[in-house]
């Protein structure tokens, strides 16, 4: 795996094998029995899946050394965001749906909404 030492690769592979065994130990329930019995089996299966998912997250985070909480993505303030069509302006409507051309009328509507 790119950028990793061989030793951590083997640790990661062991962790992935362990997680695979956890998931294989909880097969989907068989569709037999009364409706209520099937519903109860599925409910218990989903609860076990949630536990396995939590265990898998803990195993991977300890193996990879990453934090439990996701790192928040820093976004620029909305006032600084704008639509720039300087590259694509001048192309006709035959370019298709993906065209980023903005008409003067819609640009005025966008401008009036941001001045409030």
Swiss-Prot record:
One GO cellular component, as annotated: host cell nucleolus
Compartments it resides in: Host nucleus, Host nucleolus; Host cytoplasm
Any coiled-coil regions, as ranges: none
Ranges for region Homomultimerization: 18-26
Entry keywords, A to Z: AIDS, Host cytoplasm, Host nucleus, Host-virus interaction, Methylation, mRNA transport, Phosphoprotein, RNA-binding, Transport
Motif mapping: Nuclear export signal and binding to XPO1: 73-84
Residue segments, region Disordered: 27-47, 87-116
Pfam family, one: REV
GO terms, molecular function: DNA-binding transcription factor activity; RNA binding
GO biological process, one term: mRNA transport
Description of its domains: The RNA-binding motif binds to the RRE, a 240 bp stem-and-loop structure present in incompletely spliced viral pre-mRNAs. This region also contains the NLS which mediates nuclear localization via KPNB1 binding and, when the N-terminal sequence is present, nucleolar targeting. These overlapping functions prevent Rev bound to RRE from undesirable return to the nucleus. When Rev binds the RRE, the NLS becomes masked while the NES remains accessible. The leucine-rich NES mediates binding to human XPO1.
Function of the protein: Escorts unspliced or incompletely spliced viral pre-mRNAs (late transcripts) out of the nucleus of infected cells. These pre-mRNAs carry a recognition sequence called Rev responsive element (RRE) located in the env gene, that is not present in fully spliced viral mRNAs (early transcripts). This function is essential since most viral proteins are translated from unspliced or partially spliced pre-mRNAs which cannot exit the nucleus by the pathway used by fully processed cellular mRNAs. Rev itself is translated from a fully spliced mRNA that readily exits the nucleus.
Family: Belongs to the HIV-1 REV protein family.
Other observations noted: HIV-1 lineages are divided in three main groups, M (for Major), O (for Outlier), and N (for New, or Non-M, Non-O). The vast majority of strains found worldwide belong to the group M. Group O seems to be endemic to and largely confined to Cameroon and neighboring countries in West Central Africa, where these viruses represent a small minority of HIV-1 strains. The group N is represented by a limited number of isolates from Cameroonian persons. The group M is further subdivided in 9 clades or subtypes (A to D, F to H, J and K).
Protein name, UniProt field: Protein Rev
Lineage, opening ranks: Viruses, Riboviria, Pararnavirae, Artverviricota, Revtraviricetes
Gene coding for it: rev
């Amino acid at each position: 795996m790119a950028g990793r030492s061989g030793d951590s690769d083997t640790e990661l592979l062991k962790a992935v094998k362990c997680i695979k065994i956890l998931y294989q130990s909880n097969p989907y329930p068989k569709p037999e029995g009364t409706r209520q019995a099937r519903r109860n089996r599925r409910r218990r299966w989903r609860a076990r899946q949630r536990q396995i998912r939590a265990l898998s997250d803990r195993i991977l985070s300890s193996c990879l050394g990453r934090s439990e909480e996701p790192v928040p993505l820093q976004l620029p303030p909305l006032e600084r965001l704008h639509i720039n069509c300087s590259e694509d302006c001048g192309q006709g409507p035959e370019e298709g749906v993906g065209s980023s051309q903005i008409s003067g009328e819609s640009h005025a509507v966008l401008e009036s909404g941001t001045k409030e």
